[in-house]
């Protein structure tokens, strides 16, 4: 059931230069957040977008994007996100390239803090995304976008007729490996334990596929190469024995973590930490909406995140109109 948040009866005691009040705040600047900003700006809401210290989302570490509509020749991830940003700014969005460190969604206007600076917003769109879980190796970081990936759907095409490895033992890893069989000549699954954790049907499919080989009790200790990946250093978790594996690509598939720590105890989260919605993009709190991978653990694509951002902006604008924060004549017919 949606909670009706009462308007605040007190005004924060801050200097006007430190307190900023907008009709709409958008937390996050990936495809969802910036699409929301584009639509909200066109509705004259002049949204403030909190882009974070590492702005523009996961596509900033994606080399070639070939599945986003409108770019038949493909486009570099950073270039695509810069176009998103430019379009949002063109229509009147303000970007704050710092992280929101605290929020109070208990009353309206909602309160957000960036360090010691406080911001107020009549509505909020949460578009903080989800981060792939990585192995944490310095060499892994070095080769991201140059043979190391966490998205088979995004990057699998670039490994046609190559030998690659997939790290992980759950459904995510099994799904990624099976998807990659469309492109790669051979896939070696590297599993830390002596068994998969994924569903039986997914295991059966992997075991039956001629392109998939499995190495149990195996972890990656180093990613090696020159310009791109060409070898993995491995360790047997049972015996400690070290070995190497020649591959041209490494896919990390050990799961995702939604970036929702900021909202714990205020928004409803599922057991994995993803935001729950009650209808469309609405949360249990009136005036708070979500978009993108912060609640979508199924698709996780730039185009679906952008669609979510569009919906969240329209939902937020209509809600602001319904509570009298904007005049009906201000509303856009899109």
Give, region by region, the residue ranges found by the protein language model.
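Extended, non-globular alpha-helical segments
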Residues: 1-15, 45, 126
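A Rossmann-like FAD-binding core segment of flavoenzymes
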Residues: 2-10, 88-114, 118-119, 181-279, ...
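FAD-site-proximal beta/loop scaffold in flavoenzymes
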Residues: 5-14, 21, 131, 136, ...
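Beta1-alpha1 glycine-rich phosphate/pyrophosphate-binding loop at the start
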Residues: 16-91, 162-163, 174-200, 270, ...
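Conserved phosphate-binding and hydrolysis motifs of nucleotide-dependent enzymes
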Residues: 28-33, 129, 168-170, 292
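Glycine/small-residue-rich loop that forms an oxyanion/phosphate-binding "nest" at active or ligand-binding sites
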Residues: 95-160
């Amino acid at each position: 059931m949606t909670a009706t948040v009462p308007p605040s009866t007190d005004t924060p005691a801050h200097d006007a230069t430190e307190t900023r009040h907008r009709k709409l705040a958008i937390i996050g600047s990936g495809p969802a957040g910036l699409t929301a900003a584009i639509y909200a700006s066109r509705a004259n809401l002049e949204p403030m977008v909190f882009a974070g210290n590492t702005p523009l989302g996961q596509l900033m570490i994606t080399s070639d994007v070939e599945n986003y509509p409108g770019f038949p020749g493909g486009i570099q991830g950073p270039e695509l996100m810069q176009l998103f940003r430019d379009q949002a700014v063109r229509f009147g969005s303000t970007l704050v390239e710092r992280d929101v460190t605290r929020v109070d969604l208990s009353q309206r206007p909602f309160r957000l803090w960036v360090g010691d600076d406080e911001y107020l917003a009549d509505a909020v769109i949460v578009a903080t995304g989800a981060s792939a879980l990585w192995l944490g190796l310095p060499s892994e970081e070095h080769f991201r976008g140059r043979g190391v990936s966490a998205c088979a759907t995004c990057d699998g095409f670039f490994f046609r007729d190559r030998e690659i490895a997939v790290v992980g033992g759950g459904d995510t890893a099994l799904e990624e490996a099976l998807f990659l069989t469309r492109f790669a000549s051979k896939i070696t699954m590297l599993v830390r334990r002596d068994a998969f954790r994924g569903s039986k049907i997914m295991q059966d499919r992997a075991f039956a596929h001629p392109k998939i080989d499995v190495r149990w009790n195996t972890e990656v200790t180093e990613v090696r190469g020159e310009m791109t990946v060409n070898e993995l250093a491995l360790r047997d978790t049972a015996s400690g024995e070290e070995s190497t594996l020649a591959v041209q690509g490494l896919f990390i598939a050990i799961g995702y973590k939604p970036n929702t720590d900021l909202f714990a105890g205020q928004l409803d989260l599922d057991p994995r930490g993803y935001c729950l919605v009650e209808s469309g993009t609405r949360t249990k709190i009136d005036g708070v909406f979500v978009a993108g991978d912060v609640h979508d653990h199924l698709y996780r694509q730039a185009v679906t995140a952008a669609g979510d951002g569009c919906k969240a902006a329209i939902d937020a604008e209509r809600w602001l109109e319904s509570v009298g924060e904007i005049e009906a004549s201000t509303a856009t017919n899109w």
